[in-house]
Amino acid sequence: MGGIQSYLRDFVALLPPEDVVVFASTQDPMAAREFDKSVPYKVVRYSSKLMLPTPQVKKLMVDLIKSEGVSTVWFGAAAPLAVMAPAARAAGAIQIISTTHGHEVGWSMVPGARSVLRFIGQHSDVVTYISDYTLRRFQRAFGEHPKFVHLPSGVDVERFYPVDEKQKFELRDQLGWAEKDKVIVCTSRLVPRKGQDTLIKAFPEIVQRCSKARLVIVGEGRIEGKLRRLAARDQKASSRISFEGRVSEEKMGMMLRGADVFAMPCRTRGGGLDVEGLGIVFLEAQACGIPVIAGDSGGAPETVTPASGVVVNGRDSSGVAHVIVDLVQQPAALMSMGHAGRQHVVDHWTWEIMGARLKSLIL
């Protein structure tokens, strides 16, 4: 399940099931059947793997709005699905909500796509956004008509939680990490924007200054081979780097709780087309009570406070090394930043907060 699908699944789970009808594509028929049986709300499937605003999809949507008496239509991916907003309103919808995820920044930079965003804005009552950065980049493209509402993913603070020192050492034993290791974890897709290469380039300097440092890279992606080759260039450093691949949500939580620092020095690429919309992983790490090192791309800096994390230039490996070494060698700072991060998430980023925000928009 991709990021947008997960986002929508988690938000829909917060709504009264008797008031919800989901119209969705079918990526995997068997998985779709199992999912649909497991949820308490009604799911209507479009047979194709991809849902685009075609005449067939529009007709099915209109029929569903009429048959179910739908008053609010929520387009889970504004671009391009919300071009069907006029048809939804003509079918009886009173409120149109269109949700953005970050890729609309790229659309706003291309004249033809920008005009599509303007059309969506003219016919939507609410456009939601995941970060102030993305709003700044595309607000003018959507125009003045819609109300803009901040609606990022929430964090499950019962699944992502901190542990005490004894529990941390027990987790490390299960994960094969030494008690005295200084563990830096990065969990993300292995793609150029995320900055795992910067961490690997920084690591020889980190190990030179902190011999107990350990870098744990979690995730899969198209640059894994390149990253492994980069890590192998320095024998001493490479022995302290592990590639964990894809892990379960349970194990990812264990890794975050057992780590000293979370680092993902993301950077903007492609002249602004490839940018970090927000970065929920930064918030999940803070919920687990560990300091965060975030790259200065897009909305990533909005996830941390000066008390809970450090924002770095994702292209400056030496600067990243300096920040990491400075942090892991200060146990008191690790603890205070971890506490601050947990409180930051509990106060501002829980699903309870985000769910209430969504419910306030629905008529």
Where do the language-model regions lie?
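Short His-centered aromatic/hydrophobic patch
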Residues: 75-81
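N-terminal strand-loop element at the rim of the active site
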Residues: 1, 6-53, 134, 139-141, ...
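A short, well-ordered alpha-helix in the C-terminal region of glycosyltransferases
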Residues: 319, 326, 333-347, 357
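Carbohydrate-associated surface elements
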Residues: 133, 154
